[in-house]
Amino acid sequence: MKLIGLLIVAYLLGAIPNGVWVGKAFFQTDIRQAGSGNIGTTNTYRVLGPYAGTIVMVLDIAKGSVATLLPIVFHVQTVLGTATPLLFGLFAVLGHTVSIFDHFKGGKAVATSAGMLLAYNPIMFVIAAGFWVSLIYWTSIVSLASMIAFTLITLISLVFQDWYLTGIALVLTVFVFYRHRSNIQRIRQGTESMVPFGRGYHRRQAK
C-alpha cells in the first residue's frame, strides 16, 4: 500500500501543470491558447517571457526530482533495487504528459525527465545539461537540442552499463521524438521557431 500510495503521489506531482498555473496566476494568460499551445518551458518562454519560462523549467525539473527521491526518503524498495527511484520518476513523467489537472493532456516530458535524471544521477545530469545548453547555442532550436540530448543520455548510460537507465532513457527518447514529431517536420522545412540568441538564430537573421 505504501508503494502504491507513493507512486500516486509521484504521478500527481508530475501532473502539476506549472506552465498553465504560472500563466494564469501571474500573467492572466492560458498558454494552452497561445503559441504552440504546449504547457512546457519553451512555449512559456515564447509566450510569457524568459523569467516565466525559467521559473516553469525549474518547477518542472523539481517535480521530477522530488518524485524520484520519494522511495529514498520513505525507504521504499522494489525488485528494481537501486533503480527504484527511476520507477517513481517515470510516474512523474506520466503525470506531466497525461495530467489529471489538464484533461489528461500535458507537456513533452523534457524538463520532468531531466529532473528524474538529476535525482538519480547528478553527474550524468550535468553532462546532459552541458550538451543541451551547447546545442541550443549552436542551433538556437530547443526542440532539436532536447531530442539530441536525450539520445546522448541513452548512449552515455549504455557506455556506463547502467542497464535500467539505458532502457528507460531509450523509451523516453522514443517518446520525446514522438511528442516532437511536428517540430521535426518544421525543422526539415526550416520553419522551426528559434530562441532569439545563439549561432543558429544569427545565421537565420543574416539570410
Curated annotation (Swiss-Prot):
EC category: transferase
Pathway: Lipid metabolism; phospholipid metabolism
Main location (coarse class): membrane
Organism name: Levilactobacillus brevis (strain ATCC 367 / BCRC 12310 / CIP 105137 / JCM 1170 / LMG 11437 / NCIMB 947 / NCTC 947) (Lactobacillus brevis)
Keywords, ordered alphabetically: Cell membrane, Lipid biosynthesis, Lipid metabolism, Membrane, Phospholipid biosynthesis, Phospholipid metabolism, Transferase, Transmembrane, Transmembrane helix
Function according to Swiss-Prot or TrEMBL: Catalyzes the transfer of an acyl group from acyl-phosphate (acyl-PO(4)) to glycerol-3-phosphate (G3P) to form lysophosphatidic acid (LPA). This enzyme utilizes acyl-phosphate as fatty acyl donor, but not acyl-CoA or acyl-ACP.
Protein name according to UniProt: Glycerol-3-phosphate acyltransferase
GO cellular component: plasma membrane
Listed transmembrane segments: 3-23, 54-74, 81-101, 122-142, 158-178
